[in-house]
Amino acid sequence: MTGTALPPATAAGAGAPARQDRPPRHRLQEFYENPQTPVSSGPDRARRMARMLARALRGYSTAAVVLDVGCGDGAATSIAAQRNAGHHLVGLDWSADALRQARRLGLTLVQAGVEPPGLPVAAETADVVIMSELIEHLIDTDSALDEARRVLKPGGSLLLSTPNLAAWYNRGLLALGVQPVFSEVSLRGVYGRPGSQVAGHLHMFTRRALTGLLTAHGFSQLRVSGARYHDVPALLRPLDLAFCAWPAAASILLVHARKS
């Protein structure tokens, strides 16, 4: 992929005064600007995104415009670019710290978030929007999906991945009164669940909830698949891989949807 300049935003409301941040958004900004907050994509997620993008780009005879929203440190974006050469990729993230890391990879980058006031991108500009393990971090998922749909061309693809609240091990943990993996009750520490790292997850989804939300926001032709989670203990990894065949209980939900 190669970098490309994006057209200026022409959506309704462009140029209007930005609304003032609410206190929770300020706290989230501080959380994501902290160098200790994880922004790395990890090799599994990077390869997964590259494969999803390759499938979405099949049949394009001209260079497609791809927006990777929530690109983090750019590692996954860079791999996707290398494996899908000839298309235009732009990485977007609201964290200046994450973008400082991503710039070392020579990517085209924009500091912006998918929540209000939205992306500095004209309506119906993008062929593909990637939201790889992003939606669980957002305060306003409705506005984010509205914005993704706004910038997509008719029939354009939304590629989305997110941890599964109903993963096979979470079903057992919840039955035992243990907080499910991936879910969080605080940005300051981990309480009541396995693990020690705070990731900033604000929303969690089952397959049914996620597909219902996407359909309500004007996306159709939903294709859902499952993926494994890299932190599953070694002895349980074959089981985690097997559950990928049953997306409703897989560790990670992968969705390819199209703008209706």
Where are these regions (language model features)?
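N-terminal auxiliary segments of SAM/dcSAM-dependent transferases
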Residues: 2-18
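Conserved class I S-adenosyl-L-methionine
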Residues: 63-72
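Class I SAM-dependent methyltransferase SAM/SAH-binding core
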Residues: 74-117
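A short acidic, Gly/Pro-enriched loop at the edge of an enzyme's catalytic core
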Residues: 117-128
